[in-house]
């Protein structure tokens, strides 16, 4: 898979929350994880259940979760590419209401992996507080970033500090 074929590639959100950039990469990789194809590297704050890179596989039926601890995160490193993000979709796992679903988080972008700029922030949000809930968040397209971080900034709906995700999808434009 040549990264150049994704230069100036764009998918904007319409009404299909999990048919974005990762879904397209998955298809172009012959229905393989884009991380296995070398297109992206996914870096969790830690991993104890499954592989964090699976959150970008369309229709993944399991989930990734972090250890208990403050400010867990997952970073999407586009390596040779950069993304101008305009929307993202999150899907939580199959736990009941008021369990470990995200409640407060931020999405941040960086080009050096150290200094991050805020892209979107959700505080005390209840959109994902149910079994397999999903939601898409849209905003003005960002500058191009190599790294996108989803950082949990407060306790989840269970009042704990572990992060759980089933699926993540990004929309916007990729460039070299």
Feature names for model-found ranges:
Residues 78-80:
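A short glycine/threonine-centered beta-strand motif
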Residues 20-26, 31-75, 86-87:
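Eukaryotic beta-rich interaction modules
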Residues 1-38, 176:
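Activation corresponds to long, low-complexity, non-globular regions
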């Amino acid at each position: 898979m040549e990264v150049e074929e994704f230069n100036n590639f764009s998918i904007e959100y319409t009404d299909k929350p999990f048919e974005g950039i990762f879904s397209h990469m998955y298809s172009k990789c012959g229905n393989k994880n884009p991380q296995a194809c070398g297109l992206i590297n996914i870096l969790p704050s830690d991993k104890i259940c499954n592989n964090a890179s699976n959150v970008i596989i369309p229709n993944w039926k399991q989930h990734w979760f972090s250890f208990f601890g403050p400010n867990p995160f997952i970073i999407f490193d586009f390596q040779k590419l950069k993304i101008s993000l305009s929307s993202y979709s999150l899907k939580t796992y199959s736990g009941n209401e008021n369990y470990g679903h995200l409640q407060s988080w931020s999405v941040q972008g960086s080009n050096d992996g150290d200094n991050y700029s805020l892209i979107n922030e959700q505080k005390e949000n209840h959109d994902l507080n149910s079994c397999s809930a999903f939601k898409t968040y849209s905003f003005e397209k960002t500058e191009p970033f190599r790294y996108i971080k989803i950082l949990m900034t407060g306790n989840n709906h269970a009042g704990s500090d572990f992060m759980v995700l089933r699926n993540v999808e990004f929309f916007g434009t990729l460039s070299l």
